[in-house]
Amino acid sequence: GSSALGFWNEFIDFDKKHVELIGVEAKYAAPLSTNAKVAILHGAAQYCLTDKEGQIAETHSLSAGLDYPGSSPLHGLLKDSGRARYTNASDKEALAAFKLITKLEDIRPSLEPAHAWSECIRLAPKLKKSDVIVVNNCGKGYKDKKIYIEQLGYYPK
């Protein structure tokens, strides 16, 4: 959320044809990439996951930073205006991205950017070789070391 907004600040005024902003949410905490409705959460109108009764829904993600039913109102504005698009990645996809990026680039992303790396891996084969992808690798994986060990059985040195 806020990390992406800060990162996008330098790119937001570029023409959408030249710079696409893609936000990646956790699959089971994804109000912007699903059919979530606008609701009030913590005093702000925002896209929010709700249950059948309109109450705030439960979410799940291995990533504590993405395990949240709402979204920044600014992300909602970017979605509604078409300036940004949002997708999501499952825990399994984020873990697979962590493994690949660690192996190929010797980068150990935290769980939050591992979701973004997952989208990068999905998107890259569809692009021209001259296209550039910039990923906000905003956190070190060491903070999620325990989760990586529980899920993968190891944490790379």
List PLM regions with ranges:
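Short glycine/serine- and small hydrophobic-enriched flexible loop segments
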Residues: 9-12, 100, 118-125
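Short glycine/serine/threonine-rich phosphate/pyrophosphate-binding segments
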Residues: 1-8, 31-32, 113-120, 142-145
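Catalytic phosphate/nucleotide-handling subdomain of diverse soluble enzymes
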Residues: 16-24, 119-157
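Flexible, glycine/charged-enriched surface loops at secondary-structure junctions
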Residues: 107-116, 130-132
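Short, flexible coil/turn micro-motifs enriched in small/turn-prone residues
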Residues: 1, 49, 101, 134-136
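Anionic group-transfer/hydrolysis microenvironments
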Residues: 27, 114, 138
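Gly/Ser/Thr-rich helix-start
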Residues: 2-3, 7, 24, 66, ...
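Active-site/ligand-binding loops adjacent to catalytic centers
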Residues: 13-18, 23-107, 111, 150-157
